[in-house]
Design a protein with these regions (language model features):
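Metal-dependent phosphoester-hydrolase catalytic domains
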Residues: 99-111, 171-192, 197-300
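A Trp-anchored, charged/polar loop motif used as the substrate-binding/catalytic surface
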Residues: 7-8, 127-142, 175-185
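Solvent-exposed loop/turn segments at secondary-structure junctions
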Residues: 27-31, 58-62, 100-101, 157-161, ...
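Extracellular polysaccharide-degrading/modifying enzymes targeting complex plant/algal/animal polysaccharides
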Residues: 64-86, 90, 96, 101-126
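N-terminal, active-site-proximal structural segment of metallo-dependent hydrolase catalytic domains
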Residues: 1-92, 148-150, 281, 298-300
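Acidic/histidine-rich helix-loop elements
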Residues: 1-7, 122-126, 161-172
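Beta-strand-turn-beta hairpins that frame and shape the catalytic cleft
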Residues: 92, 97-102, 125, 132-156, ...
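Solvent-exposed, polar/charged alpha-helical surfaces in well-ordered, non-transmembrane soluble domains
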Residues: 8, 12-16, 37, 41, ...
Length: 300
């Protein structure tokens, strides 16, 4: 990682925030988890140790053996379960200072899109029988905190763009979020949802109402972590509050949006939170166009 200014920036930022639990998105997966363990070691060298990790195999780049994107060929990145140049590209990494409980860990990444309740899938049968719902991965687990289990649900949903009038990616994104909402119905409390839904409640492409429905889930609270940088970079044509934006995308479209969320269950006490987006960008490189969202919670 020594030659990557972006990775060095990410390590410094994480070490300065000092999270107990961290969900990293777009982290390439390998079968032996060498990259994940190297990142752990590099983070420890920065002064912040996160001893425990979970890295489910992502759907990105996983071959389906059929022509999904309709280009007349099989085996391209558009024919994978989710777009990817290789299996494991842009995966999901969960790090923690508290041990994960394997008995409560469940990977929902292999559930087929056509089989979820009230599916929006319109894929033909030959695609529907293989197409998974999760764009990257969807994982639930728990940690023990002060002798009490805290459940976690994390996922990275499809971008609701890069398609056509058929809105396939938009419909898949909506169903991923709706499926997560159904999992929350069954999830024991207390819990925390950590997700890149790729969907803003008000602005940008996608089924925005689905995001508003998730935020209004009766078991969730939305602390609305904010930043001065988001406010200072406001897109005047947007409806949503700029201070809540979490990603710095090109203007004017899509512009800055709120797509990254930490949503605790209602029985957790929210102490503090924010989005790491300084009002004035420093010359040093950003870790990512997605800003780090953080939330401090305590047991009631």
């Amino acid at each position: 990682y020594g030659k990557s200014s972006q990775i060095r920036a990410a390590l410094r930022l994480i070490a300065s925030i000092q999270p107990d639990i961290l969900a990293l998105q777009r982290f390439d997966w390998d079968a032996e988890l060498r990259a994940a363990r190297a990142f752990q070691s590099a983070l420890k060298a920065q002064g912040w140790e996160m001893q425990h990790l979970l890295a489910p195999r992502p759907n990105t780049g996983v071959a389906t053996g059929i022509d999904i994107d309709g280009d007349g060929q099989i085996g391209g990145p558009g024919d994978a379960q989710s777009y990817g140049a290789f299996a494991g590209q842009r995966g999901l990494l969960l790090l923690s200072r508290l041990p994960f409980n394997p008995k409560t860990s469940k990977d929902h990444s292999q559930i087929h899109w056509a089989n979820v309740p009230k599916t929006r899938s319109t894929d033909p049968p030959e695609i529907a029988k293989v197409q998974r719902l999760a764009y990257v991965a969807m994982l639930q687990t728990s940690v023990t905190w002060d002798r009490q289990s805290i459940y976690l649900l994390t996922f990275h949903a499809s971008p609701p763009v890069f398609d056509g009038p058929e809105d396939r990616n938009g419909r898949r994104n909506a169903d991923e979020i709706a499926y997560a909402s159904g999992l929350i119905d069954q999830l024991p409390t207390p819990f925390v949802l950590l997700a890149n839904t790729n969907l803003d409640p008000f602005d940008g492409e996608g089924h925005n109402a689905v995001m508003r429905q998730l935020l209004a889930h009766p078991k969730l609270q939305d602390p609305q972590p904010a930043s001065m940088g988001g406010q200072a970079s406001a897109n005047l044509q947007h409806r949503g509050p700029a201070r809540l934006d979490t990603v710095d995308w090109p203007d004017p479209r899509p512009g800055n949006l709120r797509v990254n969320y930490i949503l605790p269950s209602r029985d957790l006490a929210v102490q503090d939170g924010g989005v790491h987006w300084p009002a004035k960008a420093r010359p040093a490189p950003h870790a990512n166009s997605h800003r780090l969202v953080w939330q401090d919670v305590s047991l009631p």
